[in-house]
Each structure stands twice: as C-alpha cells, then as structure tokens.
C-alpha cells in the first residue's frame, strides 16, 4: 500500500512538473527595451515582472536596458524586440520618416523637461533665468523646445548665456559652477546631481510654463499590432497593473528593479527618481484615468509642436492615428 502511495505521489509530482513546463512553453517570449540604463522611471516594469502580472497574461518578459530612445525605436522597427519604452517625440520623428512604429500607451503625460539648478541660486520661475548661464545639449529634445519655452515666457535668447555639452558635461558644468542651470529631466538629472553633491536642486518645469509635450510611452511595430493585437493588449493590461501597483508601493518597485539589476543605482536615488516620475503619469484631464490612458488632444498638440519645432514635416499635423492608438488601453 505504501509503495502504491509513493508511486502515486511521484506520478502526481511528475504530472505537475510537466503541466508547469507546458504552461511555461505556452507563454509568449517578449522583450521590452527601455530608453536608457536603469533609473527610477523604469521601476514599474520590474514590479510587474516580480508580481507576476506579465506571467499571468501568458507573457515571458525580458527587460533590456536601452542606449537612448532613438536606438530603442530602431530595435522595435526592425522587429528585434517586441516593445519599447521610449520618448514619444523621438518615435514621432522616426515614424514621420517611415519607421513602422506606433505608440500603444503614453505613461508620462506631463513632460519632465526642465531647467534646473542648485536651490541656493533662488531660481524658481522663468524670469529668474534671465542673465544666467544654462548648460544645454545641442540637438536633443530639450534644446529644441528651449527657444519655445523662452519665447512663451517673454525672454529673449540673448538674455540667457548657454554652454554646450553632453549629459555628463552639463552636470559637471553646474557642479563646478561654470553654469547656473542645465536643461534636463527632473526625474533623471536632478536626483543624480543631488546624490553626487548632497545639495538640493530646484527645477523650473517646461510643462508648468506653457510647454508640455507627452513624453515616454510604450511603442510597438505596426506589424506586431496588425498580426498579434491580442499580445499587445495583454502586455498593456499587465503594464497598467504594474504602474498602479507602483503608485501604491514605490519602495517595492525599486526593490524589484534592484533584485533584477543590483547595479541599477543607489536605492535612495532610485526612489527619489521614481517619486519625481509618478506625478508625471497624469494631467488634470486624466487624473482619474488609468495609467497610459491619454487625452488625444495632448497627442495632437505634441505632434503639432514637433511639426513646428522638432523637424517633422508639417503635413503630419493632425494625423494622430499614424502615431498613436488607444485601442489597447481601454
């Protein structure tokens, strides 16, 4: 009798193992490429992975760090990865030039773009920027919208001195006193400099003074959207849950990211970055909506601004459907 029970138990375990393996084989292998090396903004996707939200949707998810939104857009367009998390303005420029990609959900609906400096500079509003030296990176998204920000706030470009450099050079210019401010994202550069120096920074957000563009979102190839819309829907469903869980427990989200990538950064800095990101998920119009659900007028206004200042053909104005679909976040 005992021998029979032992055989039955072993058979049951084997059956469960087989069922588990079969279930794993049935999951869709999916790669999400981020826009950059890990920082706090990326934490929700790792929390979704840790909590099994993607697994529950039949997705075996791998998250890859990126090397800039441009590279992420190229990888999605080429079919090297299924999804990308990227700057939507960068995607719009690529799509306008023929890249077969589209956004399927907008996470950052308020732009993190800002002019920032140390708090002791007492720069709290656009007028305080007059007479200051600002470090910029020529050709990036911030530098393209900087003249618009100045114009809307009645500041002549000649009233502000600029120095040029990449992200590291800009940070060093501010830290070393060669510049009063730099153009950067409030959820990225700001916490890094605060960690580096131990001094508080203050940011003047473009979005608070007339220049708001939708920022980062999930992108997919038009081929994937057409051939496997159900996969896109499942991925977005899991991602929406992941962001909602992050808002409730940001510390857990940071811990989940560090579990996968222990070298992602200082936990405190990552948490500061995430805390600065969460308020960017919604505008006043979408504050009661779920994550990734954006107002179409905000997509349209961003496209218009990109057409006017970002190098996109003016013929693209108003053609929101070429760049974004709300089908998968309903």
PLM regions with names:
Residues 157-161, 263-275, 312-320:
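Short, surface-exposed acidic
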Residues 89-90, 169-173, 177-265:
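Pocket-lining segment of extracytoplasmic ligand-binding domains
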Residues 25-166, 170-176, 180-187, 204-206, ...:
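Short, glycine-/small- and polar/acidic-enriched structural segments
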Residues 1-9:
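Bacterial N-terminal signal peptides that target proteins for export
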